[in-house]
Amino acid sequence: MKATLYTIECISNLHVGSGQDNDGVIDGLIQRDVVTDLPCINASSLKGALREHCEEWNKNHKEDEKKVNVVKLFGKKVGGEENCEAGEYRFLDASILSIPRPSVNAPFVQVTCDEVVTELQDKASLFGVGLGDNEEKTILDLANVSEQNKCSYKDFKKYSNNDELPVIARNCLENGVSKNLWYEQVLPRKSRLAFFILHDDGEINKAFDSAITSVPVQIGANASVGYGICVIKKC
C-alpha cells in the first residue's frame, strides 16, 4: 500500500455541510473533525466530489489515455448498497492546514499552529510519504504560512470556531417576498486543507492526477452561487 498527499486551496468560500441539526442561529454548519473539532472535509464527501469531477472530465476528454477509469478507482454500485464494489483508491478526510486572517500589513495572512503541522507530519510518516529534510518548512510552505504567522493551538481553535468563521445569509424569494431565510457557515476562501489517497504500490493514476490537478474542482454545496471552487495540487 502506498499513499499520495494532495493539498486543497479554496478559491471561493466552501460549504460542505455536516448534515446535523443545530438549535443555534446558524442553520447549516460545516463538517468538523470528530476529535479536534477543527474544520475538515469528510472522506465520503471528498470522494463524491472527486468522482463527480472525474465523470465530467471524461465527458470532455474523448481520448482513452486522458479518461479516468472511474469504476476501477472509485468503485461502483449495482442496484443497492449490498451490491457495492469497492474501488482501488482509499480516500482519507481532508484536514485543515491553514485559514486566512485579516492583517494590518496585508489584506490577509495565512495562519496555522504546531499541532496541525505535527498531525500532518505524523500521518505522512505513517503512510511513508516523504516531506524532505525539513518537514516543518515543507508543511508551512504547503499551508502558505510563514514562521512568524504560526499561532497557538488555542488561537487557531478560536479562529476556526463557530463564532469566528464566516456566516452567510441565504434568502429564498417569491415575487419579491422572502419565503425562507437561512444562515450557512463557510470555510473562507484561501483556506487550505490536505488529504491522502491510499493506493496500490506504484505511482498514482496519471489520468486521475491530471483530472483533479489541471483544472479547478468543485467541492461541496451551492455550486450555482460559486461556492466550493478549489485548486488541488499533488505534493
Annotated model-derived regions:
Residues 1-235:
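RNA-binding basic/glycine-rich loop and surface signature characteristic of RAMP-family CRISPR effectors
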